[in-house]
Amino acid sequence: MPFPVTTQGSQQTQPPQKHYGITSPISLAAPKETDCVLTQKLIETLKPFGVFEEEEELQRRILILGKLNNLVKEWIREISESKNLPQSVIENVGGKIFTFGSYRLGVHTKGADIDALCVAPRHVDRSDFFTSFYDKLKLQEEVKDLRAVEEAFVPVIKLCFDGIEIDILFARLALQTIPEDLDLRDDSLLKNLDIRCIRSLNGCRVTDEILHLVPNIDNFRLTLRAIKLWAKRHNIYSNILGFLGGVSWAMLVARTCQLYPNAIASTLVHKFFLVFSKWEWPNPVLLKQPEECNLNLPVWDPRVNPSDRYHLMPIITPAYPQQNSTYNVSVSTRMVMVEEFKQGLAITDEILLSKAEWSKLFEAPNFFQKYKHYIVLLASAPTEKQRLEWVGLVESKIRILVGSLEKNEFITLAHVNPQSFPAPKENPDKEEFRTMWVIGLVFKKTENSENLSVDLTYDIQSFTDTVYRQAINSKMFEVDMKIAAMHVKRKQLHQLLPNHVLQKKKKHSTEGVKLTALNDSSLDLSMDSDNSMSVPSPTSATKTSPLNSSGSSQGRNSPAPAVTAASVTNIQATEVSVPQVNSSESSGGTSSESIPQTATQPAISPPPKPTVSRVVSSTRLVNPPPRSSGNAATSGNAATKIPTPIVGVKRTSSPHKEESPKKTKTEEDETSEDANCLALSGHDKTEAKEQLDTETSTTQSETIQTAASLLASQKTSSTDLSDIPALPANPIPVIKNSIKLRLNR
């Protein structure tokens, strides 16, 4: 079985004597014969998904990295000569390429890119890296698609070297020469470095620390391969959208390995779900005790930094300066992940009892059958190059929209699918490149209320304004770059998405919306990084049955997915039930295991909860509320609690039918919001008749438009948001989205 990266030193075969982690292990039990059999079955199940790379491809990567390393050494010698360094220094000046990320961890998949770091001595400037080294790469015949992103948060050179995509960061150390045996984990290397170099070094330092903090690297790698595949298949692998990225999943698996140091992969996968389905967030996950290096770098510490108290699911990197790798997680994304952990525990319980096979764990749930209501975001650009830039910007802001939606008092959950899809063209005769994302919505059951309106117009419009402004400020914006949103019922999704994505071959009514058909073959789900999610599929052509992690099946009454300006959609609220997964049924007596929480910070009283008023007039925000998030359960042990995040306030932005939509709206404290009430399923148990009224704000007449014509017709000038830089004198046209849902009892 291939393990694609050489390990750091030999791994001990005897049960480890060293203590790993910040708590004692839960169990030191050695693997049984049945565990070995299950592990082999796990390996066989993983193979069709392409998670293992062939030895030939591995050697090709090693050869390419060797060539790149030689180029770096040659380039640094040339720079040294041009700066008139002594010959004795030039001969030993060194320079080296380090790797990090999935390749360094040894868990990269077939065709995955390589994250690399170029380390240079003190006399080599960053400007040299982006000029002379860039020019040197350009001369290499194996190098294609060379591009520099010098102004990025972490500056990078991207290239394709002999068919392998590589991202190269740069760090200049305060050393005269770079020795071959340099250990980047040495904190003293960070002294006198600029912040860009520290950021560039962070990836390597974190990856190397993780590998040094696990008892057995091979067991860690196989377990991480399985968990990463599971996360991708279940649409919860995306740091940028508020789920977890590769390094976060690696740290969760590493913590599991520390708690069960002698266990092998089959056991570790099960224990992973056991530990994190019971974890008392927001207690942080730590692989080692944080160390202070007195370098005055900002580190994650909720005792010192009030903003750190808002983090809902902290997973702390082990290398200084310690950071929370999951600061993007929201109430909704955490709830989705916790429910998936519980479902994973239930499935692995069955596997250990020989009631199910490993393939069941990797069955993909059908996101498009899970919810009754969806928001579809569409981004379009006139060229493919512009589309790539535009899509990257829009995707990086979607989590802000999700955070805004979940603060609506009538929205229980806003679940974004990390996959993006090609969208039908607005004008078949016009060259246009379009991408869409889908957000599933769950509405709370309304009590003793009638005709409550859920107005999402402000949230959508402020989101589009934010995206446009950043595009303008970064000089990325082009005239034909557009973004729009629409409310879509589940029954209408087939007109936006191809059948093989929906996984449901059922005849649907086409009444209400007509969209250009999508070409199934145009779907591209091959992107694989922390921020762009891919969904590996087994090489066999067998179709997996959708695994609905929450067992939901919603109603199918169908409105038009696009609504006219100032239109109102009437829906009935459905009761939200909480699916409970009985994690105490885990095999091997695991139900009685106490999961040690890793928080060591003393409890701190959070600052007073804000009561913020805001005035909404179309899209103008006055006195914007601070970013906040929903409350989460903390550990019962007061000595190990961290400050509870400030409870997210719910917007009462949905006036009664008779109220004016422009009426002043206030935010109220939601002191009793319980994350456990955010259910993913059970909507159909109280499913009632739904009716759709589409009425304009002036004529009250029913109007149905096609999605394409809607996007062309709803364009107005965007107004200003007080917390965002103003638009230029001639504001660009922004698609106005009026999405109002009326909840009827």
From Swiss-Prot:
Residues 508-643 are annotated as: Ser/Thr-rich. InterPro entries: NT_sf, NuclTrfase_I-like_C, PolA_pol_cen_dom, PolA_pol_NTPase, PolA_pol_RNA-bd_dom, PolyA_polymerase. A motif (Nuclear localization signal 1) lies at residues 490-507. The modification N6-acetyllysine is found at K641, K650, K736, K740. A motif (Nuclear localization signal 2) lies at residues 650-665. It comes from the Eukaryota. One of its GO terms (cellular component) is nucleoplasm. Residues 1-22, 523-565, 577-704 are annotated as: Disordered. Mg(2+) 2 binds at D113, D115, D167. Its EC number is 2.7.7.19. Polymerase that creates the 3'-poly(A) tail of mRNA's. Also required for the endoribonucleolytic cleavage reaction at some polyadenylation sites. May acquire specificity through interaction with a cleavage and polyadenylation specificity factor (CPSF) at its C-terminus. This is Poly(A) polymerase alpha. It comes from Homo sapiens (Human).
